[in-house]
Amino acid sequence: MEKRQLYSSQSQSQPLNIITNTINSRPSLLRKPASSSSQSNDRISYPPSTDSKFIQQQYHQPLLTNTDIKLEDIESSSSNNNPLKNSINNVSMQISQLNSSHHSRALLMQKRNNPTTNIRPTVKKKLDDTHKPLTSNFKKPITPISKLNTNMNNNNINNKNNNININSNNSSNSNNNILSPVQNNTISPNSNLLNSSIKFEKSNFFSTMYSSPTTITTTSTTLNNDNNNNISISSSCSNNSSFDLQQQHALHERMNKIDQFTQTVRGNLQSQFDNISEQLKPPRLSLSIQDIKTRLDFEEKNKEVEKIKLELKNVLQSLKEKEKELMEAHYKVSQVSVLKDNMERDLQQSNQMILDLQHEIRSSSLKAIQVDEKFNNMKDVTKDLDDEILRLNQLVRERDTEIESLRKENRELLEKSRSDEKVRRKLHNTIQELKGNIRVFCRIRPDFSSGQGANGSVFNIPAGTDNLVEVKSPTIDSFNGEASIKKSTFTFDRVFGPSSTQELVFEDISQLVQSSLDGYNTCIFTYGQTGSGKTHSILGDLKVPSQRGMIPRTVEKIFSSIQDLTEKGWTYQIECFFLEIYNETINDLLNTTTTTTGGNSKSNEIKYEIKHNPDTNVTTVTNMTVVPVTHPSQVYELLNLANKNRSVAKTLCNERSSRSHTVFQLKLIGYNQQSSERTQGLLNLIDLAGSERVSRSGVEGKQLKETQAINKSLSSLGDVISALANKEQHIPYRNSKLTFLLQNSIGGNSKTLMFVNISPELKDLQESTSSLRFAAKVNSCELGAARKQKII
């Protein structure tokens, strides 16, 4: 909006500028030119002359300027007493009077040009002297008006309502140069130095001048330069279209150039005219009274004209200031209008916000009422809860007192439990010693053949007993040849029949497992012929929980007992290794780089050596793979790996016969944080190779050598047992690797359990009887009291 008002003000001020420039640029001889000293070199110099008639004849124009200003039907929206309109009318009347004075002066100049005047030769001579330089000065090229018109047409100023035509039809200026008025060394008396006619045609200029500042006007100006040098300026204002800012700027530049050109020509002409007037001025005494009066009138009129021009300039300046004030007022009004609109919009928003807030206040009031109701209800509930909290706090205090009492009692019980644990261990060890540090269990394998069962004529367990086994062996009397049944009875610590389960067998073994947790060395080994069920008793089927043997069940029992002992402050570290003695050679079954399959040993030449520590009574094997375990599943994986690496072969007695002795050892290291007590126990689970006669097993070659090595080691074990039973001074432990490894287990520093496994089949009667006799010999041995392991 501000931009539109500024554009309108520029459009309105343009006609005023055109009027001012036209009046100021009027080439009148009445105006005093600038001093001749400040004139540039391109000013036009007229030849001096004193003969006005001669000048009129040369130029064919009147000496003075005839100026007619016609103001016709000035339409304005203002009243008739408009000061600008009255000022312009006064200027028009004064200029008309001045024109009449110009004509009278021309007549006076013509009277002076009579035959009696003797200054004509002098004028002609001076004109001849100055003709050449005058012509050369007028030859300077000036930009033609027609060219300006062409440029303006190229800028699309030929619009219907925005049209500025500048036509130059001066026939005397065909070369687009201003020539000297001197022709043939004479000055035409009928020529006008400058004859201008300024006409203000009927227009809407003054009406638009006082119209609304937002109206954008268009000015159409036509400058016509004819043969008489008449300049007609016509201005009209229209409300239908507007100047483009860029085109208007270009138009103003061209108008300024035209004004400068007009000022330059006017100044040059005035300067030359003054020079000519001075040269043509007759002697003072030669002027008549009428001429002096005319000259004085001329000077008066000139002063009046200058005064009128000054008044007009002041009026125009005042009008511009009023227009500027009006524009500022309109701008302020527009700002106030915008501010008003903004305030109204803000007021509407504020009213809407007030309505919303009132609605929220009403809603909040309802909610506050509801909250108050809930608060009152909550106060009642809170009061009840406070009472309940007081009651519960009292109950908690009572419970705390009771808990503290129970904790105290628990600490006392724990202390008593630790002392009872010591008593239990002592009593448990005493019971095991009373039972014997070496005990023998007998287990009869179920009969898988079609012959007599174990409860038949071969083996029988008397009713009401669990430690006797009767052997019914058919015999033939050598004296009379009669067949008879010979009965033999063997007594052991416990006898298990063919129907005994793995769980039942392990119940009595678990007592020895507890001894190993208490810090004692324990040893459990199986003995019997091939196929009597030794491996089944010691390992069983790991995939079927009910068929698991002593080793898996022992591991489960140990971890279960450790869990119970943890509550009493005990922590345990468990390590294990698994080895075999094959042909008097020790192999590590947990070492993946050493494998034995079918009796073919593939070793990486690692040497294993058995060492006994007499101070701690601990037996170790060098270079053995010791694996720490924390869960029974880890032990199962190790057992599977050991079974794959164990040496087995097919014989006549067993399709898969163990060809080596295996030793599985668990080291149990315990520590009690409360009592700082330390224990270290060893549990050896040994599966001996099957004892068999060479003639019956039918082995040859390598298997024959294996059988001989097995029988030798078992014979050495029998010799050791016999020496212990007979309490001999020298015990032959070093006769085999097996006896040397079991030195601390069967030599009086360990709790030992021997399982003798027998086959119920009649064909195995002789081998079973031999195993029973060997077990009875072991059972008759008396070992010294077992001692706890020393912790270093």
From Swiss-Prot:
The keyword Nucleotide-binding applies. Residues 437-781 form the Kinesin motor domain. It holds the Pfam family Kinesin. GO terms for molecular function: ATP binding; ATP hydrolysis activity; microtubule binding; microtubule motor activity; plus-end-directed microtubule motor activity. One of its GO terms (cellular component) is microtubule. Gene3D superfamilies: Kinesin motor domain (3.40.850.10). PROSITE patterns: KINESIN_MOTOR_2. Residues 284-423 form a coiled coil. Induction: During the developmental stage. ATP binds at residues 528-535. Residues 34-50 have a biased composition (Polar residues). Signal peptide: none annotated. CDD domains: KISc_C_terminal. It is found in: Nucleus; Cytoplasm, Cytoskeleton, Spindle. Keywords: ATP-binding, Coiled coil, Cytoplasm, Cytoskeleton, Microtubule, Motor protein, Nucleotide-binding, Nucleus, Transport. One of its GO terms (biological process) is mitotic spindle assembly. It comes from the Eukaryota. Residues 22-50, 162-183 are annotated as: Disordered. PANTHER family: KINESIN-LIKE PROTEIN KLP-3, PROTEIN CLARET SEGREGATIONAL. Belongs to the TRAFAC class myosin-kinesin ATPase superfamily. Kinesin family. NCD subfamily. Microtubule-dependent motor that is probably involved in microtubule organization in the mitotic spindle. This is Kinesin-related protein 2. It comes from Dictyostelium discoideum (Social amoeba). The gene is kif2.
